[in-house]
């Protein structure tokens, strides 16, 4: 097997990694390295006098053989890229004979081995990963579209909290759609040379993918900021600037992505804009994402501390407990019933009792552990695992977690914060079965409020 045929076979194997990793095109790195080596070899050969007896410098597709005198042997190590296959690359020898260069010895498949079983194993593995993330994104898109339709159609559910949820759902849809667009544009088929592809569609798909990713992280951060402000506020009517969150959630990704596109057009308009993660312009995209994940993690810890401090038996006030049940555990607080006055009025005739709305069941340890787990998909805390590692680190674990499980994040968020939301379920039931609208006030929370002893009242409050 000659060097060109062996290089082609290696590229076929590397292409499997490229399809699975999206922007980590190992085969493109290999091709780029070969092209650089070939160019350097040809330039060196042009500056050498080949008129003397012997063998001229030549490029055989993998290695650059220098000018050599007749009867001499030359030994060169295999290209460094073969070390990716976990084996120690050997060396190849060639003899300069009277008739020219001899064939490489040992042959390239022997000197620069690639385990043949990798072809089948890696193809099966990466194909499975692609099927998983394609299925996950498809399910997420359907679930998120239904969730947005519900939150938009039911007027009683309109409030800042659900507005932010809707924006986050939209970013998950955009992110999943960008994955499909990029797969279609960059990996159109096995014969597509996406390493040298420089079409407008390819570049647009990469830019849209980066924009979708940034908007998703920005709205994950918006969720954390909103909840932190909500829990830290002292007045039930104090609200964070919702429209500032909207402006930041969509405006900052537009600004960063636009800046990155401008830099690529001006300074690095090569191939499909998605090959060199070492480029300094890559940090225009990567930097804000790393920062948002770090801030989100800090807010996550801060929220847990606030809940521990304010939700104790003697410290949990009306406003904080209301926000806790309404935001973190929206499906587990039983619905309030219509107030009923007592008919057996005795000495305590000034007391009006309303059925408990579920706060009594909000035991701190159990609720705190549940809310902690539920904040992880809502804030994207799981991204902290790989976000500060190099893109090529831990690929064996990173691929199934980030591409596979990450594709279902939108579905999980839609289920937890819409389909299992008690407020949403009751409003749907009211619309479907015609229940009394008073059973679901527009902005209901599960709280209780105790007035002075002679007139103890338990009421429902409105807080979103």
Curated annotation (Swiss-Prot):
Kindly list the biological process annotations in GO that this record carries: adenohypophysis development; adenylate cyclase-activating G protein-coupled receptor signaling pathway; cAMP/PKA signal transduction; cell maturation; cell surface receptor signaling pathway; cellular response to glucose stimulus; cellular response to insulin stimulus; determination of adult lifespan
Residues modified by glycosylation: 50
Q: Where does the UniProt annotation locate this protein?
A: Cell membrane
Q: What is its biological role? A: Receptor for GRF, coupled to G proteins which activate adenylyl cyclase. Stimulates somatotroph cell growth, growth hormone gene transcription and growth hormone secretion.
On whether Disulfide bond is a keyword of this UniProt record, the answer is yes
Topological region Cytoplasmic: 152-167, 232-240, 305-372, 420-464
Record bears the keyword Mitochondrion: no
Per the record, ranges on the Extracellular side are 23-130, 189-210, 262-283, 394-398
UniProt keyword list: Cell membrane, Disulfide bond, G-protein coupled receptor, Glycoprotein, Membrane, Receptor, Signal, Transducer, Transmembrane, Transmembrane helix
The name this protein carries in UniProt is Growth hormone-releasing hormone receptor
Leader sequence range is 1-22
Record-annotated membrane-spanning stretches:
131-151, 168-188, 211-231, 241-261, 284-304, 373-393, 399-419
Under the heading Pfam families, the entry gives: 7tm_2 (PF00002), HRM (PF02793)
Molecular function GO terms recorded: G protein-coupled peptide receptor activity; growth factor binding; growth hormone-releasing hormone receptor activity; peptide hormone binding
Q: Which cysteines are joined by disulfide bonds?
A: 41-64, 55-96, 78-112
- Membership in a protein family: Belongs to the G-protein coupled receptor 2 family.
The organism's superkingdom is given as Eukaryota
Membrane topology designation = Multi-pass membrane protein
- Gene Ontology cellular component terms for the protein in this record: cell surface; cytoplasm; membrane; nuclear inner membrane; nuclear matrix; nuclear outer membrane; plasma membrane; sarcolemma
Write out the tissue specificity statement of the associated record: Pituitary gland.
């Amino acid at each position: 097997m000659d060097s060109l045929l062996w290089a082609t076979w290696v590229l076929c194997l590397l292409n499997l990694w490229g399809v699975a990793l999206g922007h980590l095109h190992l085969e493109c790195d290999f091709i780029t390295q070969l092209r650089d080596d070939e160019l350097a070899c040809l330039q060196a050969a042009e500056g050498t006098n080949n008129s003397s007896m012997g063998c001229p410098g030549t490029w055989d597709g993998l290695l650059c053989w220098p000018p050599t005198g007749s009867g001499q042997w030359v030994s060169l190590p295999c290209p460094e890229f073969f070390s990716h296959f976990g084996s120690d690359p050997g060396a190849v020898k060639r003899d300069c004979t009277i008739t020219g260069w001899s064939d490489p010895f040992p042959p390239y498949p022997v000197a620069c081995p690639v385990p043949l079983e990798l072809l089948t194993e890696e193809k099966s593995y990466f194909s499975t990963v692609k099927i998983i993330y394609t299925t996950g994104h498809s399910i997420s898109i359907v679930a998120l579209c239904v969730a947005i339709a519900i939150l938009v159609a039911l007027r009683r559910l309109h409030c800042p909290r659900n507005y932010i949820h809707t924006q986050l759902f939209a970013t998950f849809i955009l992110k999943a759609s960008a994955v499909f667009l990029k797969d279609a544009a960059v990996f159109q088929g096995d014969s597509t040379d996406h390493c040298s592809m420089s079409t407008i569609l390819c570049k647009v798909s990469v830019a849209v993918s980066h924009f979708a990713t940034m908007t998703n992280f920005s709205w994950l951060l918006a969720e954390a900021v909103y909840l932190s402000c909500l829990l830290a506020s002292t007045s039930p009517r104090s609200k964070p600037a919702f429209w500032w969150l909207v402006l930041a959630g969509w405006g900052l990704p537009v600004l960063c992505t636009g800046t990155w596109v401008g830099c690529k057009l001006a300074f690095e308009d090569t191939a499909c804009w998605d090959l060199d993660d070492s480029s300094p312009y890559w940090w225009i995209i990567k930097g804000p994402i790393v920062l948002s994940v770090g801030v989100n993690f800090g807010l996550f810890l801060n929220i847990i501390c606030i809940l521990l401090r304010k939700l104790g038996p003697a410290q949990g006030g009306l406003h904080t407990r209301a926000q806790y049940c309404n935001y973190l555990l929206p499906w587990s607080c039983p619905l309030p019933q219509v107030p009923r006055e007592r008919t057996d009025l005795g000495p305590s005739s000034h007391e009006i009792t309303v059925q408990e709305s579920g706060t009594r069941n909000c035991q701190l340890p159990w609720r705190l552990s549940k809310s902690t787990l539920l904040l992880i998909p809502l804030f994207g805390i799981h991204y902290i695992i790989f976000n500060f590692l190099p893109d090529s680190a831990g690929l064996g674990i990173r691929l199934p977690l980030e591409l596979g499980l990450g594709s279902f994040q939108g579905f999980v968020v839609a289920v937890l914060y819409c389909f299992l939301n008690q407020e949403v379920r009751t409003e749907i039931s009211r619309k479907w079965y015609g229940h009394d609208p008073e059973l679901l006030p527009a902005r209901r929370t599960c709280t209780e409020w105790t007035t002075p002893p002679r007139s103890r009242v338990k009421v429902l409050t409105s807080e979103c």
